[in-house]
């Protein structure tokens, strides 16, 4: 708990999960209002999202075997790319299908990536790190969803992707900060 790398990894976990849930928690509402989709179409979008997500978890598991940090960073780029695509594509139907597929792919392994990344910073206390990963992930869900709701009330659901973007930048910066600390330790 005293290792700076562990604390930074915990913050990354929180920011990553908060990023994804600030928009995903309002998935149906977002597609209804911002993309002008009816409820039946939204159901199909959820199906696409889920199917792609199953594939993404398999891919993420394979990638984790090669590099936990690179895998986490790869999937975190979705917190930057997906919000930009969602915001700037208005209600283009077929483009939205592709974006929802990408969203499902980048989002679905988020708990796997966040907890594995966090645990990798404390290999001597894996059980403890795992329990904190779950707790901070749940905190990220709560805070991301709450702030997403506040954005909806103040500005509208179409602006929730910007919250995802901001939390994503914070999560990526935590990975960079941890890398700097680890490089300093190895050079000393």
Where do the language-model regions lie?
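Helix-to-loop junctions at the C-terminal end of transmembrane segments
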Residues: 55-68, 152-153
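A late C-terminal transmembrane helix in Major Facilitator Superfamily
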Residues: 120-159, 163-164
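Residue-level signature of mid-helix packing/kink "hotspots" within the transmembrane helices
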Residues: 50-58, 141-142
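Extracytoplasmic gate region of multi-pass secondary transporters
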Residues: 5-47, 51
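Intracellular helix-loop hinge segments at the cytoplasmic ends of transmembrane helices
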Residues: 29, 111-121, 134
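Juxtamembrane helix-start elements in MFS-like secondary transporters
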Residues: 37-46, 92, 96, 126-130
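Multi-pass alpha-helical transporter architecture, strongest
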Residues: 165-188
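C-terminal transmembrane helical hairpin of 12-TM major facilitator-type secondary transporters
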Residues: 69-114
